[in-house]
């Protein structure tokens, strides 16, 4: 439907029998009204044409082939000069065959049928409206018992029949025959009510606003009573108050949406368009039919039987009619929701029939599969793995995914650079994976962001923009800091990749959706890009160091001369001297050559402003040299001073892990400063 703002929208709810009839009924150009499905047949076994008034009738649902009627005559669609607009022999209109995707039919039920969703689903809407137990309503719907109608105080057939049960045995066989004569159902319906018709009558008699007033008054009265001191009674009162609140909310919803309660009981059963429940011919001439067709046939068979019992048979026992009404109710229940009342209906191969509920609900249902989430072009999907070397705003795309997503852009680049004469040649180069293809792909990806999405998308951080780069393998590489926004981890999670095509979408991705633009939670303002457990453990290992202390290895200013260019092992690690390094590169190079450990203490020459060294810490030791220079040794650094007490060099006691962390922080600060400037 289209609202007042011209927005397309879908609304699900109850509709009146008049609305169902308006959807399904159509008037042919000759004035004939069609739309009711009366026969349980699909296709004729000889001609393979739809049966008239059947589940695939062309008069009701439209022609199978555009502009061709059931007789085989052809008319041009949309030609105003063509007359008539339908075939006078078969009654099929000359219209587009796509009408069979939305043209509905209906089945006129011989008795009212309760919609099983409103009766059996929890909470039961019908039970809430009538304020009766669900088991009692089920017994009434499925004709297990009846209730007497309020009538005047006069002799009734119910009383008469009760008296006959105690009379002489000679009347035993004649009295039931009297109660099953033609026309007795009129007297029976005057005094008793059963089946879905009884539910419909009670729902039709309800005044919704009166229900709200009485429910609110009762809820207020229960609230004023207070606690009784009995735990069981208090729980009972609490459950009653919750029920009254749910009842008032339900009634308000019906009033707001202009839905009548009696619409929860069906008199007309809609028939889906045939293209939504097709019969397909496969190899070998075999036919495959949708399960819904079999369930519709079951409903029509039982409904026609009940119609015959009510109209043609003269001596039909009342119990037989009630039993047939129950069968019609069960057939409609199976069509709407197979298995909701217990054992589901199965076919000859012991396979459960898929009902209407099974078609639309679940992950593979109509809504989540094709309406809410559908497959789109320029998208891909793969497993995510950690990419610790990536920047926060970058992601790694596998070559297979990248070349498929950006194939049209690569083709345009090949043609513009005169590397391919046409699209076919460009596609051949891509299939053969020539080196120039990857070069152009990298150029295209540099200026084109991509969107990463992880289901379920519960908030706006569930889909963010990244700058893609090519990586080896078949998994998407992701920076670990952005995982919290996606609620993702690296234990097999999958993410979807989308390419924004329009300039507006690309601008929105760059300005609003880039990962480095979403560092704070939009809900509470807390940081969303925080280190994960893996990163915290890595930082701890990186900065833990060896805590032997400076006194464990007595200082010797010439220990750096004893540093050997050889690997170390655990046997001589404890007795090894602490080496001296002049810069970062020497220390990291020694670690990569496995001459020192990640947490090995070392002395590193530090270019530091002398004004920063203003600590009042007393040196642990002071060593003097023959030339007058001396070394002041502190807990984590040492200072070499001249004779005039001027600082010559400063060495800090650190580890390779601390050095690596410091360099990363320094590069990040420098990059941020350059970006801001």
Curated annotation (Swiss-Prot):
Q: What's its top-level EC category?
A: transferase
Q: Does the record bear Hydrolase in its keywords?
A: no
EC number, UniProt record: 2.7.7.6
Q: So what does this one do?
A: DNA-dependent RNA polymerase catalyzes the transcription of DNA into RNA using the four ribonucleoside triphosphates as substrates.
Instruction: Summarize where Mg(2+) binds, as residue positions.
Output: 489, 491, 493
Q: What keywords are assigned to this protein? A: Chloroplast, DNA-directed RNA polymerase, Magnesium, Metal-binding, Nucleotidyltransferase, Plastid, Transcription, Transferase, Zinc
Q: Which family does it belong to?
A: Belongs to the RNA polymerase beta' chain family. RpoC1 subfamily.
Quaternary assembly: In plastids the minimal PEP RNA polymerase catalytic core is composed of four subunits: alpha, beta, beta', and beta''. When a (nuclear-encoded) sigma factor is associated with the core the holoenzyme is formed, which can initiate transcription.
Instruction: List residues traversing the bilayer.
Output: none
PANTHER family, A to Z:
DNA-DIRECTED RNA POLYMERASE, DNA-DIRECTED RNA POLYMERASE SUBUNIT BETA
| Taxonomy of the source species | Eukaryota, Viridiplantae, Streptophyta, Embryophyta, Tracheophyta
Name recorded for this polypeptide: DNA-directed RNA polymerase subunit beta'
Q: Which residues bind Zn(2+)?
A: 69, 71, 87, 90
């Amino acid at each position: 439907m289209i609202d007042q703002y011209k927005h397309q929208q879908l609304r699900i709810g109850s509709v009146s029998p008049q609305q169902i009839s308006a959807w399904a009924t159509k008037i042919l150009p000759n004035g004939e009204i069609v739309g009711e499905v009366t026969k349980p047949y699909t296709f004729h076994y000889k001609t393979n044409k739809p049966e008239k008034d059947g589940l695939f009738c062309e008069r009701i649902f439209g022609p199978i082939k555009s502009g061709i009627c059931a007789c085989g005559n052809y008319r041009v669609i949309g030609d105003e000069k063509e007359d008539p607009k339908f075939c006078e022999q078969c009654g099929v209109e000359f219209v587009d065959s796509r009408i069979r995707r939305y043209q509905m039919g209906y089945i006129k039920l011989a008795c009212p049928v309760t919609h099983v969703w409103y009766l059996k689903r929890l909470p039961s809407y019908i039970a809430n409206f009538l304020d009766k137990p669900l088991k009692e309503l089920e017994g009434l719907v499925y004709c297990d018992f009846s209730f007497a109608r309020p009538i005047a105080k006069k002799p009734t057939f119910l009383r008469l029949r009760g008296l006959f049960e105690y009379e002489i045995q000679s009347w035993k066989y004649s009295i039931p025959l009297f109660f099953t004569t033609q026309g007795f159902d009129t007297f029976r319906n005057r005094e008793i009510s059963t089946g879905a018709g009884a539910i419909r009558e009670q729902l039709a008699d309800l005044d919704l606003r009166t229900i709200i007033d009485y429910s609110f008054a009762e809820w207020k009265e229960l609230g004023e009573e207070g606690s009784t001191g009995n735990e069981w009674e208090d729980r009972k009162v609490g459950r009653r108050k919750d029920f009254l609140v749910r009842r008032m909310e339900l009634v308000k919803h019906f009033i707001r949406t202009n839905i009548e309660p009696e619409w929860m009981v069906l008199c007309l059963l809609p028939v889906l368009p045939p293209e939504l429940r097709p019969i397909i011919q496969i190899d070998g001439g075999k036919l495959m039919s949708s399960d819904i067709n079999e369930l519709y046939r079951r409903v029509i068979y039982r409904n026609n039987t009940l119609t015959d019992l009510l109209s043609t048979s003269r001596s039909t026992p009342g119990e037989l009619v009630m039993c047939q009404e129950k069968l019609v109710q069960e057939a409609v229940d199976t069509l709407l929701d197979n298995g909701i009342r217990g054992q589901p209906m199965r076919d000859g191969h012991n396979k459960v029939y898929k009902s209407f509920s099974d078609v639309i609900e679940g992950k593979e249902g109509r809504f989540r599969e094709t309406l809410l989430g559908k497959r789109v072009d320029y998208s891909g999907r793969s497993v995510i793995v950690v990419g610790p070397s990536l920047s926060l705003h970058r992601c790694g795309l596998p070559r297979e995914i990248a070349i498929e997503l950006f194939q049209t852009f690569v083709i345009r680049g090949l043609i513009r650079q005169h590397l391919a004469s046409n699209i076919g040649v460009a596609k051949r180069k891509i299939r053969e994976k020539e080196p120039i293809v990857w070069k152009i792909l990298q150029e295209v990806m540099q200026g084109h962001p991509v969107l990463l999405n992880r289901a379920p998308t519960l908030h706006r951080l569930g889909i963010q923009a990244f700058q893609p780069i090519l990586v080896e393998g078949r998994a998407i590489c992701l920076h670990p800091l952005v995982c919290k926004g996606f609620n993702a981890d690296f234990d097999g999670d999958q993410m979807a990749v989308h390419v924004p095509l329009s300039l507006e979408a690309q601008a929105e991705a760059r300005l609003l959706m880039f990962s480095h633009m979403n560092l704070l939670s939009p809900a509470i303002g807390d940081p969303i890009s925080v280190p994960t457990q893996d990163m915290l453990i890595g930082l701890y290992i990186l900065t833990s160091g060896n805590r032997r202390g400076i006194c464990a290895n007595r200082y010797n200013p010439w220990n750096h001369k004893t540093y050997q260019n050889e690997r170390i092992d655990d046997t001589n690690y404890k007795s090894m001297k602490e080496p001296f390094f002049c810069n970062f590169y020497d220390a990291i190079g020694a670690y990569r050559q496995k001459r020192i450990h990640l947490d090995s203490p070392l002395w590193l020459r530090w270019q530091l402003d002398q004004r920063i060294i203003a600590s009042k810490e007393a040196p642990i030791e002071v060593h003097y040299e023959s030339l007058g220079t001396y070394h002041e040794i502190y807990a984590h650094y040492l200072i070499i001073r001249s004779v005039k007490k001027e600082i010559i060099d400063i060495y800090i006691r650190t580890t390779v892990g601390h050095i690596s962390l410091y360099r990363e922080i320094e590069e990040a600060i420098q990059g941020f400063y350059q970006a801001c400037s």
